[in-house]
Amino acid sequence: HTTPYAGLIYDINDNWSAYASYTSIFQPQNKRDKAGQYLAPITGNNYEAGLKSDWMNSRLTTTLSVFRIEQNNVAQATTIPIPGSNGEFAWKSTDGTVSKGVEFEVNGAITDNWQMTFGATRYVAEDNEGNAVNPNLPRTSVKLFTRYRLPAIPELTVGGGVNWQNRVYKDTTTPYGTFRAEQGSYALVDLFTRYQVTKNFSVQGNINNLFDKTYDTNIDGSIVYGAPRNVSLTANYQF
């Protein structure tokens, strides 16, 4: 299947440029309906436009974009079991889904030794009747990452990041009423330190989920908790 793409970039001046793009969507799915048949591929259109800036020879770059995604055959979870599937629940297709939102990202070298990245996304997704589509996916997310190389010990780099998302939920209708599973907003903090032993060899230590946040990653079904606080040590050699 061929998916057309078209894009246009206009340089406003030495620092600013504007762009617009269009992409056709064709995405096969691995979800099955109540008859056990795989859902038809997602089809639709993706429109995006925005502004980009570049300052001080790319030491600071920014991107601001708006987007609109029109889709048919979008999978949504149901509570109907698929016969003979050992407990697998069926999915249904939803047509006329429209997602629209805005994204912002800034990347900068604050100093020669200190880099930082910040990004945020906000969008809404509704079907042709105005109902929320897949509210189990976060509508707002924010990320911040930074790293710093110590001037006194240039082989040593430390850094970390924060990823935040808003609350998500899933409504399930049963003969006894409608029940809502919900995961509140949460932030995950990660840290790392890397030491460049030689030009080709480095070691790195990571602490993931620093504050040991408990969160559910699967409110569609049974509770699946995200990884608790964990520590890892890796070695890397580049030939």
Where are these regions (language model features)?
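Residues that define the transmembrane beta-barrel architecture of outer-membrane proteins
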Residues: 2, 43-47, 58, 98-100, ...
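Residue-level signature of outer-membrane beta-barrel architecture
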Residues: 8-12, 41, 51-55, 108-109, ...
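Outer-membrane beta-barrel channels and translocator barrels
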Residues: 13, 44, 56-58, 99, ...
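Repeated loop/turn-to-beta-strand initiation elements of outer-membrane beta-barrel proteins
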Residues: 15-18, 57-62, 113-116, 153-158, ...
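Membrane-embedded beta-barrel scaffold of Gram-negative outer-membrane proteins
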Residues: 17-21, 42-102, 107-109, 116, ...
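Extracellular loop and loop/strand-boundary signature of outer-membrane beta-barrel proteins
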Residues: 31-39, 87-93, 101-103, 127-134, ...
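C-terminal beta-signal and adjacent terminal beta-strands/loops
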Residues: 70, 164-173, 191-239
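Gram-negative outer-membrane beta-barrel transporters
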Residues: 91-173, 211-214, 234-236
